[in-house]
Regions:
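Juxtamembrane intracellular "pre-TM" segments in multi-pass secondary transporters
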Residues: 166-195
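Extracytoplasmic gate region of multi-pass secondary transporters
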Residues: 7-8, 189-238
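Conserved MFS/SLC helix-loop-helix module at the cytosolic interface between two early adjacent transmembrane helices
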Residues: 40-78
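Short hydrophobic/alpha-helical segments at membrane-entry points of transmembrane helices
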Residues: 78-86, 192-193
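Helix-loop-helix hairpin linking two adjacent transmembrane segments in secondary transporters
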Residues: 118-164
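Cytoplasmic helix-loop-helix junction between adjacent transmembrane helices
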Residues: 85-122
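Central cavity-lining transmembrane alpha-helices of secondary-active solute carriers
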Residues: 30-46, 234-239
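Extracytoplasmic
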Residues: 1-22, 40-43, 207-215
Length: 239
């Protein structure tokens, strides 16, 4: 998940180099969210996570996200190419986050909540890693941050390919049927649970995008070296 907020961590540098407008800055992150939503819906409709072995699907998606992220410092000279690459990165991450949840669920049953919570915590720290990379040296060159994030994503994909397998509680899913969605809407308990879940992290992702920019501006005003804002952002998001 390090690639998700990789460009968000270097937006100030990209703004200086590419002359990003405020909307361009926002789209560097929003494109990922949009790609993820479309990818997750498409994956669900096509039953990709059940038709392709989950560890393999996870690995392919992680490798693709890493490749697309690395293309930005290699090829991009502005938002015209970077934003589509970010959208495709989000599309790829739809095979990482939800599929990782599925794999974890196959290894847990009574303690499934603990297992999913552990995975979400790991994903959260991973999302914050680009800011740590910024602190450790990426502040001098934004490309190092993106290469670091891409490298971590590729390493995660390789580990999943070599060592991760579905657990003993794996079940085969039925064929996708639009009728299930209609029946779910008729079930009051499920409908209320769904409404509680829809958009459940919109405010958190907004803060994760805004906080590093706020910290960088605050540190700049107080004369604190800018690289320290990366460490502060890592602590805020990772905690």
């Amino acid at each position: 998940m390090a690639v998700w907020f990789s460009t968000s961590a270097v937006v100030p540098a990209l703004t200086r180099e590419w002359g990003l407008s405020p909307s361009g800055q926002a789209w560097m992150t929003m494109a990922v969210q949009l790609g993820f939503v479309i990818g997750a819906l498409g994956s669900a409709v096509l039953n990709l996570a059940d038709r392709i072995p989950s560890p393999r699907f996870f690995s392919i998606s992680a490798f693709l996200a890493a490749f697309l992220t690395a293309l930005i410092p290699l090829l991009s000279d502005g938002p015209g190419t970077a934003i589509p690459l970010r959208f495709l990165t989000g599309l790829s991450l739809a095979g990482v986050y939800p599929v990782g949840m599925k794999i974890m669920a196959t290894w847990t049953r009574e303690n499934r909540g603990w297992g999913i919570g552990l995975l979400v915590g790991a994903l959260t720290v991973g999302s914050a890693v680009p800011h740590l990379a910024n602190f450790l040296g990426g502040f001098k060159d934004w490309r190092l941050v993106l290469y670091s994030a891409a490298g971590l994503a590729a390493a995660g994909g390789l580990l999943a390919l070599l060592f991760v397998r579905e657990g003993p509680y794996a079940t085969s899913a039925p064929k996708f049927d639009w009728g299930y969605a209609l029946r779910a809407w008729r079930n009051k308990e499920i409908t209320l649970a769904n409404f509680g879940y829809f958009g459940h992290m919109w405010e958190l992702y907004a803060v994760w995008t805004w906080a590093p920019v706020f910290l960088a501006a605050s540190f700049d005003l107080t004369g604190i070296p800018g690289r320290w804002s990366g460490l502060a952002a890592f602590a805020v998001i990772g905690a």
